[in-house]
C-alpha cells in the first residue's frame, strides 16, 4: 500500500512537492485549506478533528496530501467500504492549481485503493463547482446521467457550512 505512494513521492520530489498519506497530524493545515476554498461544504461533525480521525482510522492508507516545504497545498479524503472507493473534499490551494497536483493526488489515492483490491471509485462534485467538474471530465472520469443521488440526514447536528 505505502509502496505505491513512495513512487509518487519520488516522482514529484524534484519539484519540492511530495504526495503522501494523510495523517491526523495534517488536520489543522487541511482544515485551513478547506476553509479557503470557495464553494466548499464543511460539515460540523464529519469534518471535525474527531470525524476526520475516525475516517482516517477506518481508511489509513488511502487519503493523501500534497505538501511543499512542510505546507499542505492539496488534500483528498479517500476511503472505501470494501466494494467501492469514494473521494471527498478534493482540493488544491488556488495558487498551486493547474500544475497537475490534483491529478497526481487522485492517481496516488486510486493506486492506494487498487492496492486494497478496490476496482471502482466515485466522487461527488457540486453542480456549481465548474472548475472541479471540468477537471474530472478532463482527467477521464465519467459523468453519470443515469443516476439520481439521494442522502438522508441521521444527525441534524451535522450541519454543512458553505465557504463563500
Q: What would you call each of these model-derived segments?
A:
Residues 1-25, 156-164:
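Conserved N-terminal entry element of GNAT/NAT acetyltransferase domains
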Residues 21-89, 106, 112, 116, ...:
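Acetyl-CoA-dependent GNAT
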Residues 98-111, 138:
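Conserved acetyl-CoA-binding loop-helix of GNAT-fold acetyltransferases
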Amino acid at each position: 500500500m505505502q509502496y505505491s505512494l513512495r513512487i509518487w513521492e519520488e516522482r514529484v520530489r524534484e519539484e519540492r512537492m511530495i504526495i503522501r498519506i494523510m495523517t491526523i497530524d495534517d488536520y489543522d493545515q487541511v482544515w485551513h485549506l478547506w476553509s479557503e476554498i470557495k464553494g466548499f461544504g464543511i460539515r460540523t461533525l464529519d469534518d471535525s478533528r474527531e470525524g476526520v480521525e475516525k475516517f482516517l482510522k477506518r481508511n489509513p492508507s488511502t487519503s493523501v496530501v500534497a505538501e511543499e516545504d512542510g505546507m499542505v497545498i492539496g488534500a483528498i479524503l479517500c476511503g472505501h467500504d470494501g466494494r467501492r472507493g469514494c473521494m471527498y473534499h478534493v482540493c488544491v490551494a488556488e495558487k498551486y492549481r493547474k500544475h497537475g497536483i490534483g491529478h497526481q493526488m487522485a492517481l496516488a489515492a486510486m493506486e492506494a485503493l487498487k492496492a486494497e483490491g478496490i476496482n471502482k471509485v466515485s466522487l461527488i462534485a457540486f453542480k456549481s463547482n465548474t472548475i472541479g467538474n471540468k477537471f474530472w471530465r478532463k482527467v477521464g472520469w465519467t459523468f453519470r446521467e443515469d443516476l439520481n443521488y439521494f442522502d438522508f440526514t441521521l444527525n441534524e447536528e451535522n450541519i454543512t457550512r458553505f465557504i463563500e
